[in-house]
Amino acid sequence: MEYGKVIFLFLLFLKSGQGESLENYIKTEGASLSNSQKKQFVASSTEECEALCEKETEFVCRSFEHYNKEQKCVIMSENSKTSSVERKRDVVLFEKRIYLSDCKSGNGRNYRGTLSKTKSGITCQKWSDLSPHVPNYAPSKYPDAGLEKNYCRNPDDDVKGPWCYTTNPDIRYEYCDVPECEDECMHCSGENYRGTISKTESGIECQPWDSQEPHSHEYIPSKFPSKDLKENYCRNPDGEPRPWCFTSNPEKRWEFCNIPRCSSPPPPPGPMLQCLKGRGENYRGKIAVTKSGHTCQRWNKQTPHKHNRTPENFPCRGLDENYCRNPDGELEPWCYTTNPDVRQEYCAIPSCGTSSPHTDRVEQSPVIQECYEGKGENYRGTTSTTISGKKCQAWSSMTPHQHKKTPDNFPNADLIRNYCRNPDGDKSPWCYTMDPTVRWEFCNLEKCSGTGSTVLNAQTTRVPSVDTTSHPESDCMYGSGKDYRGKRSTTVTGTLCQAWTAQEPHRHTIFTPDTYPRAGLEENYCRNPDGDPNGPWCYTTNPKKLFDYCDIPQCVSPSSFDCGKPRVEPQKCPGRIVGGCYAQPHSWPWQISLRTRFGEHFCGGTLIAPQWVLTAAHCLERSQWPGAYKVILGLHREVNPESYSQEIGVSRLFKGPLAADIALLKLNRPAAINDKVIPACLPSQDFMVPDRTLCHVTGWGDTQGTSPRGLLKQASLPVIDNRVCNRHEYLNGRVKSTELCAGHLVGRGDSCQGDSGGPLICFEDDKYVLQGVTSWGLGCARPNKPGVYVRVSRYISWIEDVMKNN
């Protein structure tokens, strides 16, 4: 080990950072470290900060922060592993990847983790100490070898990996048990594999994740930022037994990849629980009975049900005996049953303390724009989307961001699910985001206008309006206000803005009329030259406050009724239509009832334009004569429709191309668009709904005796990738690329007969988009048989052509 010719060892250590780029850093917006050892510089770019960090000699620079508006750079000796992380405005944290890693690549020559015990458990001696062993490798001799404190290192390129001198006088040195990084091999089921293997086990080249050719799919990289879906590298984004990819062979949709298992043990798991927290992925109790009383099948057995959720495929998921577990990210722990007629079911696991199940389930924001009073500290609405459209992280979750704003630490702040809140008195409600690169953002909420208004709570929604009496109608913004050109010149706290050309009280060189000539930096008006997602801002005339945001209202849409935006907010409903929940009247205003000319309801449909309805082609099998049908819009009751509902006949029928189960109905006259009748939005051509997106089905269909018919019902269903849906145990290859699946695989209901032709509607950004037409399924609410829907995005050209030419 240390008996080689040390004279040449310096060749092994290139200057840290030489040739590096920002790709070697982890970036997190809105995060700041509490660091004692740091230096501050003036810097206008992140590249300048990086150069300062690489040149630092007084301490090892592990991270830096760049403050854009302050033109400031702070380089630091610590990172998020050794220092607490705080949320902060206008800062981007950059941390060197090498110092965040707790694993080794190859022989660990570049390992810079903090393990300080040997394989046998002996504490390491500090590299700078001379006792009990005089070291041959010391920080002074090898300054670039990372010989800090008593951390395990490999300064001599030992093939056996990192080691250290020990504190045992009888044992000079010993190797350390540093786990291998998952860039050359995989631990567990390869969920964290980040290597570059890009061929399947049969040798087929992988299809890039951001491509939809030759196979269209739902795993869109931008929708899964934490899954590292880069290039065409093998990955495991969905809880499979091992990494896989879509293939470049049109005849072979997907295949597993041959990733070798790491020889070292996997990193230690999180705390193992005897109760249910979140989705129960860390549950290790001994309950072995399902909710309906079926005894669980042993995980290592293939009778009565064959499966691949075995201990061999999921070695880190605790698949012991026949205990309920959640190896694949389902809603809660489950098991295969010993009943041949019931493949799998959820288990009844008691919750941990006061935590409720599914607290990590991401909820969508309401379409009706909620508002808040004051700073929003008493806001109790259900918005869960940030101002830039990112989904909020649940307050009880530590993924992807570790934090201390938990329900236990702030019991009076109503930190429920992932709803926007203001537990710390910021300027408005905010949340941590589901994007690993953006720690937090303010939420997509407006301040309530007017006086004497009451505080919004979870049961009340209000539509904010612009106070045109105090500000001209043009003094409002769209989106983040990058194009705002109004004359507001005070911050949210009422402080007067500093002129953009002024250098007092705050000096600045970046955001001036000369450097940003097209940003409208006139006078001291609020502007957003850097595209800040939190909106327009300005430097302030307060010497102690460099900058602050301005309170600019959102512009009211010129359209009275936008597609996909109901005037009544749909309720959050955890059930399905079978045994599901009743919809709020008129919360799905595009839903139509397709009836015979005698008034009998037999199918659903979706209004997509004032004179056009989309439904299923099989709903029109009883007659090719348009006069045989009529639609009713704006109703909630199936029988005895409300007086304000609209009954309109059908003038023409258009069935989809190539016998697709989709059809357009042209109405005798345009529907009157009002607060009870609003069209749904259409998706873009060939858009793919990401896997596990929560969508909604509505209808008056069969509830199998679980609730009375007559009122419109709704159900929430996750989209399932066709690759999964077509497995033998589910729909066995029946689902086409022009169709999509949605439902719960563990056997609770979805849409049923009577809902045919109705919508599968998904929330996107700030509106509901029609992604599917209810088409078929194997029975109703049968276990392992999700519903199948025509993929509307595949027929956008056909829809547009029919409507344009007729």
Swiss-Prot record:
Name of protein: Plasminogen
Which principal EC class is assigned to this enzyme?
A: hydrolase
Which UniProt keywords are given for this protein, alphabetically ordered? Blood coagulation, Disulfide bond, Fibrinolysis, Hemostasis, Hydrolase, Kringle, Phosphoprotein, Protease, Repeat, Secreted, Serine protease, Signal, Tissue remodeling, Zymogen
Organism, as annotated: Notamacropus eugenii (Tammar wallaby)
Q: How does it associate, per the subunit comment?
A: Interacts with CSPG4 and AMOT. Interacts (via the Kringle domains) with HRG; the interaction tethers PLG to the cell surface and enhances its activation. Interacts (via Kringle 4 domain) with ADA; the interaction stimulates PLG activation when in complex with DPP4. Angiostatin: Interacts with ATP5F1A; the interaction inhibits most of the angiogenic effects of angiostatin.
How far does the signal peptide extend, from start to end residue?
A: 1-19
Summarize the protein's role: Plasmin dissolves the fibrin of blood clots and acts as a proteolytic factor in a variety of other processes including embryonic development, tissue remodeling, tumor invasion, and inflammation. In ovulation, weakens the walls of the Graafian follicle. It activates the urokinase-type plasminogen activator, collagenases and several complement zymogens, such as C1, C4 and C5. Cleavage of fibronectin and laminin leads to cell detachment and apoptosis. Also cleaves fibrin, thrombospondin and von Willebrand factor. Its role in tissue remodeling and tumor invasion may be modulated by CSPG4.
Give GO BP annotations, semicolon-separated.
Answer: blood coagulation; fibrinolysis; proteolysis; tissue remodeling
Q: How is its activity regulated?
A: Converted into plasmin by plasminogen activators, both plasminogen and its activator being bound to fibrin. Activated with catalytic amounts of streptokinase.
GO molecular function terms listed in the Swiss-Prot or TrEMBL record: serine-type endopeptidase activity; signaling receptor binding
Q: Which residues form the Peptidase S1 domain?
A: 577-804
Location (main, coarse): secreted
Q: What else is on record for this protein?
A: Plasmin is inactivated by alpha-2-antiplasmin immediately after dissociation from the clot.
- Which residue range or ranges hold the PAN domain? 20-98
Instruction: State which Enzyme Commission number(s) the record gives.
Output: 3.4.21.7
Residues bearing Phosphoserine are 593, 684
What happens to this protein after translation, modification-wise?
In the presence of the inhibitor, the activation involves only cleavage after Arg-576, yielding two chains held together by two disulfide bonds. In the absence of the inhibitor, the activation involves additionally the removal of the activation peptide.
Q: Which pairs of positions does the record mark as disulfide bonds?
A: 49-73, 53-61, 103-181, 124-164, 152-176, 185-262, 188-316, 206-245, 234-257, 275-352, 296-335, 324-347, 371-448, 392-431, 420-443, 476-555, 497-538, 526-550, 563-681, 573-581, 603-619, 695-762, 725-741, 752-780
Cellular compartments annotated: Secreted
Anything noted about its domains? Kringle domains mediate interaction with CSPG4.
Which domain of life does the protein's organism represent? Eukaryota
Catalysis: reaction(s): Preferential cleavage: Lys-|-Xaa > Arg-|-Xaa, higher selectivity than trypsin. Converts fibrin into soluble products
Residue positions of the active site:
618, 661, 756
